[in-house]
């Protein structure tokens, strides 16, 4: 028996409403998932954009941003592995990559949050050591140097050792980041000129201990 017209209209309206609700719900869920996926993808991209692929540390760009945002009570250290090219030449670039990752692990161990660690490129690294006193920050950085010097790495049946030279400068609100960086870079040059595998602070002149240098300028 045919359905009365009024009932058919009511059924049609009900079905349309149900179908519309289903479509709207499905569309809403789909859109929400797509937005979430895009947000996750963007976050991953931003993370990867700031990370050095080999070491897992921050890259130079992210380190520069961190330095710009550090306004004081911190030390900047610029470090360079000694004779790194000879490792690549003697053992191959895979061995060099292995050394870079091992050094990065040490940096992360001794200079994790709130400190900042980065691979600036090649065999060069950057650190921003926060808080404490100048002397304590210097001692932490030198602990990193000694730990790297003590490394004995086994790679492809061969034993590899390395060392690192470090230049340190002080960050303060009165100094522009590029000025601090240049001071740390000059200190690094002096560390390399002094025979490498050492740490030189911008306040240090010749063999004068850092503690005496700090007292002289305080």
Q: Regions from the language model: what does each represent?
A:
Residues 4, 14-53, 61-73:
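Signal-transducing coiled-coil linker helices
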Residues 75-80, 117:
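Active-site-flanking beta-strand signature of metal-NTP-handling nucleotidyl enzymes
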Residues 104-105, 136-152, 185:
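Alpha-helical scaffold within the catalytic cores of cyclic-nucleotide enzymes
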Residues 45-65, 79-93, 98-101:
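Conserved nucleotide-binding and Mg2+-coordinating catalytic segments in signaling enzymes
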Residues 138, 142, 169-218:
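Catalytic-core segments of nucleotide cyclases and related cyclic-nucleotide turnover enzymes
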Residues 119, 148-164, 192:
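Catalytic core regions of nucleotide second-messenger enzymes
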